[in-house]
């Protein structure tokens, strides 16, 4: 039995160790892609499990998430490697500034530039004076009263009652609601008899 254990090939190291050894062994400045890492591991360790491709993919993803590897442009780098490019942030990078260009002058708050938003409408001086005069007075509660009609001569008698809406002869003020249905004047049989 001791001979069986001695003749067995040594077990393969864990995948993270093999991946890091492959990246170091390939020593590519632009990083190592997944297929290059896989070929290196197959060439060095020979007999691998049948699920090697899926295991390699899973371990690469796990190492990338944990920060052991940096993934950039479909290539993997060691996180602590000095030649690994810095990880790019999200979004569009800022424009490169010319070092010889002079620094922009700080904006003064009293500059004549336009402010944000729509400019206010021009107010007439009368409206401005009324608004300023009534600014101190509190607004009364409730609905404001109706304004009285201002005719040329004020009549002491109350206004006459509006004519019935049914006749249509005078164009007076109409009453509220739906007007009554107009029936044609038909002589009734009882009135004729």
From Swiss-Prot:
Where would you find this protein in the cell?
Answer: Nucleus, Nucleolus
Positions of the UniProt region annotated as Disordered: 75-193
Q: How is it modified after translation?
A: Phosphorylated by CDK, this phosphorylation prevents DNA-binding. Motility is increased when hypophosphorylated. Acetylated.
Q: Does the keyword Repeat apply?
A: yes
One GO biological process this protein is involved in is:
chromosome condensation
Where is the motif (Nuclear localization signal 2 (NLS))? Answer: 145-149
- Give the residue interval(s) assigned to the motif Nuclear localization signal 1 (NLS): 86-92
State a single Gene Ontology molecular function: sequence-specific DNA binding
Feature: DNA-binding region:
87-98, 113-124, 138-149, 173-184
- Just give the chief location class: nucleus
Question: Where would I find the H15 domain in this sequence?
Answer: 11-81
Q: Which PROSITE patterns match?
A: H15 (PS51504)
Q: Does the keyword Phosphoprotein apply?
A: yes
User: What other facts are recorded?
Assistant: Confers resistance to nickel NiSO(4) when expressed in yeast (e.g. S.cerevisiae) by counterbalancing nickel impact on cell cycle associated with an increased chromatin condensation.
Q: What does this protein do?
A: Binds A/T-rich DNA (e.g. present in the storage gamma-zein gene promoter) with a highly dynamic distribution into the nucleus. Probably involved in endosperm development, during cells shift from a mitotic cycle to endoreduplication leading to massive synthesis of storage proteins (zeins) and starch.
Could you identify this protein by its name? HMG-Y-related protein A
Name of encoding gene: HMGIY2
């Amino acid at each position: 039995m001791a001979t069986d254990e001695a003749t067995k090939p040594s077990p393969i190291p864990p995948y993270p160790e093999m991946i890091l050894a492959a990246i170091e062994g390939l020593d590519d400045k632009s990083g190592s892609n997944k297929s290059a890492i896989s070929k290196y591991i197959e060439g060095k360790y020979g007999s691998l499990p049948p699920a090697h491709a899926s295991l390699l993919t899973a371990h690469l993803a796990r190492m990338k998430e944990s920060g052991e590897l940096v993934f950039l442009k479909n290539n993997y780098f060691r996180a602590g490697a000095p030649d690994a490019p810095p990880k790019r942030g999200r979004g569009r990078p800022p424009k490169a500034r010319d070092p010889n260009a002079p620094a922009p002058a700080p904006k003064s708050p009293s500059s004549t530039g336009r402010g944000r938003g729509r400019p206010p409408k021009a107010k007439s001086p009368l409206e401005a004076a009324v608004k300023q005069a009534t600014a101190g007075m509190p607004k009364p509660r409730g609905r404001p009263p109706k304004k009285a009609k201002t005719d040329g001569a004020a009549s002491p008698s109350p206004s006459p009652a509006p004519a019935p809406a049914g006749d249509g002869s005078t164009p007076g003020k109409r009453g509220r609601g739906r007007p009554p249905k107009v029936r044609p004047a038909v002589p009734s049989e009882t009135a004729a008899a």
